[in-house]
Curated annotation (Swiss-Prot):
The keyword Nucleotide-binding applies. Its cofactor is Mg(2+). The lineage of its organism: Bacteria, Pseudomonadati, Campylobacterota, Epsilonproteobacteria, Campylobacterales. Mg(2+) binds at residues 172, 192. One of its GO terms (biological process) is ribosome biogenesis. It is found in: Cytoplasm. Its main location: cytoplasm. Belongs to the TRAFAC class OBG-HflX-like GTPase superfamily. OBG GTPase family. This is GTPase Obg. Its EC number is 3.6.5.-. GO terms for molecular function: GTP binding; GTPase activity; magnesium ion binding. It comes from Aliarcobacter butzleri (strain RM4018) (Arcobacter butzleri). The gene is obg.
Amino acid sequence: MFIDSAKFTVISGKGGQGCASFRREKFVVQGGPDGGDGGKGGNVYFLVDNNTDTLSSYKGRKLFKAENGKQGMGGNMTGKSGDSLVLVVPPGTQVIDDETNEVLFDLLENGEKILFLEGGKGGLGNVHFKNSRNQRPTYFQPGLPGSTKNIRLELKLIADVGLVGYPNVGKSTLISVTSNATPEIANYEFTTLTPKLGVVEVGNYNSFVMADIPGIIDGASDGKGLGLEFLKHIERTKTLLFVIDVANYRTMIDQYQVLKEEVAKFSNELSKRNYAIALSKIDGYYGENLEEDIKNFIKELDLEESNSNEFKFETEYPYFVQDTIYSRFDKSKPYFVLPISSLTKYNIKQLEFALYELLGQDK
């Protein structure tokens, strides 16, 4: 099960209390104090592990607590420190103070380990309180309490390419034919109820991560449909691929404009990311002239049909691609507008190489 948020209380361990004891040895009358200190309470850490991609291990749990330190012992022996608690989270997890909404940590890198709460110090044993006036002190200190924090975890997926489109436009099919992801695929809206990640292999040595984000509808940025719950997952994507369904009752330009608007309303920064456009389901087109419809869409974007073919695009239908060999990459325009079919694999390999090249434009 994909869980992208969790709320619970975290407590570090309490320090163990000090010990009040006295030396008891043969021929030693009224031995001096030898009570040891209490052990330190366990710390709480966060550890980022890219072998997990969900917060499901925290589902239904309200409290996580590190172990308390053990009591000190005679013979000036310090009590055992409490075991630390390590909370394992996937990359992209934010740790948020549930009372103030302050983002405490943004955990991105695999292997990153953060000390979150330190355990309480152990109390001092009576050996520390001997003085000239009191040779046999019975006083010892209790351990200090651990720290308590009410937190919220929120997972925002990290991907190189995020698929943005209406429900049922072919995003799940596209990620299934380009990567190792196995999303549910069916002919109804909101098949994808949780984000899916897939690794796209480009040639023998290169790859990138693609995210299938649940479909966006009009008003998604206001919380309609699956709304803000899933729009947040494209916040961390480096590049956006707008997937436009040519077999949809909505026109291509209408789909594109709504998607761009919803992304911009959700995050102005996100709307400035590099992007490209895939015209999907050309195998299911039922209009009069797909070639003319694609040409008109390219014109409506104030672009011109391309003749250059660096990526060896199929040429049955028109396409657009920025010529970065003789001119600079223009972030305000799509890197390419490409008709594809996940069913027949039309332009699929070319799409993978073009996306990989687009990811390199920011390097």
